[in-house]
């Protein structure tokens, strides 16, 4: 026996039934959809309909709300920034902001801002222009002679 002589066993494969190909095919005319009504039409699926049973979105209570004023920040640890400095991806001559962090590959997409976290050690003297920083991160940055500049929060 050779590779080009391999075949499926008799009856292992079966041609699929083609729908809507005449009355004699067995699935012609209505094509297995029954007669009339919304479900017989094209492009219709009743999302959330569970056959008359009370749907899950009505069984469960309403909960919470979406705060449109909430901000989502990119959280960046000092250890990752130091790693980028060591590998030469981050230029520390200029102030480091969200755009510089994105170009260095530290953050993927720009959200509402950047927040520094104190995880890891920082050895380089860097000026940061960020939305916020944890208290411990500020202390670590200022300890090596750096600076954290963030906008004043009003109200």
UniProtKB/Swiss-Prot annotation:
Residues forming coiled coils: none
Record's compositionally biased regions (Basic and acidic residues): 1-13
Record's keyword annotation contains Disulfide bond: no
Sequence ranges of Gly residues compositional bias: 21-35
UniProt GO BP: translation
Entries under InterPro entries matching the protein: Ribosomal_uL15, Ribosomal_uL15/eL18, Ribosomal_uL15/eL18_sf, Ribosomal_uL15_bac-type, Ribosomal_uL15_CS
GO terms for MF: rRNA binding; structural constituent of ribosome
Residues that span the membrane, as ranges: none
Region (Disordered): 1-47
GO cellular component: cytosolic large ribosomal subunit
Keywords of this entry: Ribonucleoprotein, Ribosomal protein, RNA-binding, rRNA-binding
Family, as annotated: Belongs to the universal ribosomal protein uL15 family.
Subunit structure: Part of the 50S ribosomal subunit.
Job description of the protein: Binds to the 23S rRNA.
HAMAP family: Ribosomal_uL15
UniProt name for this protein: Large ribosomal subunit protein uL15
Organism of derivation: Bartonella tribocorum (strain CIP 105476 / IBS 506)
